[in-house]
Amino acid sequence: SQINLTLRNNKYEHELKNDTEIVRLICRLLIKNLPIAYLESFIRNKKRALSFFPKNPKFILTSMGYFSNELFKIWIAEQSLLNKKFCISVHGGHHSNSLFNHPGMFTEIISDTFFSWGWTKNILSSSKLSELKKNKNDYKYNKNETKICFVVYSGNKYSGSISAAPTSTNFLESLDIQKKFFCNINKKLLDNTTIRLREVSKTWELKTFYKNLGINKFSYLETEGLKKLVSKNSLFIFSYESTLFFELLTLNIPSILLNEERFWRLNKSGMADYNNLREVNILYDSFYKLSDFVNNNNLDSINKWWLNDNTQRIKNSFLEKNARSNENYINEWINTIKKNINK
């Protein structure tokens, strides 16, 4: 559908005439900025949704359809009117530890049952992490040379939600911390560093930012798979608690989180988790200390640190609470579905 300016300019105008100027302005801006899916295309989308999705679902579970699929949103609203139960599984990383997370709160509020990966009453092991755990011997990381993969937060330039994550000028400040880290590591390590990012990061021109720091290797989520990425690198450093961080911890691949709390604010539970990770050097909140670690450790000492009993214990405990996996997850899922069948 095309934008219907006549519809948007005139709709509800007569109902606003007695409101204050600020209310009229907000309502006009709202109408003019509503996505086409919610106005011009809504009737057509509703018809498509009701013809595409099941008419009498016995079980409804999603981890992303509620925010990424406009047809699903319409369909699930119709199912809610019929009193169908709607289950949501956590979408990804940092949900459990964030001080405030509007998308996460929205997820928990709209679902009849919310499943976490370990920190709530209702728990459902991640199918993706479980599959990785079952097949972890297929993922071999580089044990011949120290090669760093730095995984960056590729948020949109203009945030569409409110959460304890760096946005706008705060995001630029977080880049300055990364700049200081890369300026403090030796040239050989810098030459052996690959930046992992998403295509959406083009809005920030991140590739140019890292190139100006002397980094010339890049890996995109959309074009390079996990197995190939793992095979090229020996140490992964994350600028945020991403789902990929959980995946590599599950695969037991050396991984470090560089996190300053002023950019990624934590709740009390998250603070406790991060303190434990900090004790065994899986987490750093200082780029100076992290640069010292990578400069003063070779591949052998990195592997020795990673395989240390205490490091492994803390890592496994963190996963059990925040990113649970289960090699027998299929039976776990079957039992969960049986308990939540729509009658």
Predicted regions and their residues:
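Short, aromatic/basic amphipathic alpha-helical patches
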Residues: 72-79, 103-104, 204-215, 268-274
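Well-ordered, non-membrane alpha-helical segments in soluble/globular domains
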Residues: 42-46, 70-74, 166-185, 327-334
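Conserved catalytic-core segment of nucleotide-activated headgroup transferases in glycan assembly
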Residues: 127-211
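Short, charged/polar "capping" segments at the starts of alpha-helices
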Residues: 69-71, 96-98, 121-125, 158-159, ...
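C-terminal alpha-helical cap of glycosyltransferases
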Residues: 319-343
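Catalytic binding pocket for nucleotide-activated donors in carbohydrate/polymer assembly enzymes
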Residues: 122-128, 143, 166, 211, ...
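Donor nucleotide-activated moiety binding/catalytic core segment of transferases
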Residues: 121, 194-251, 256, 261-262
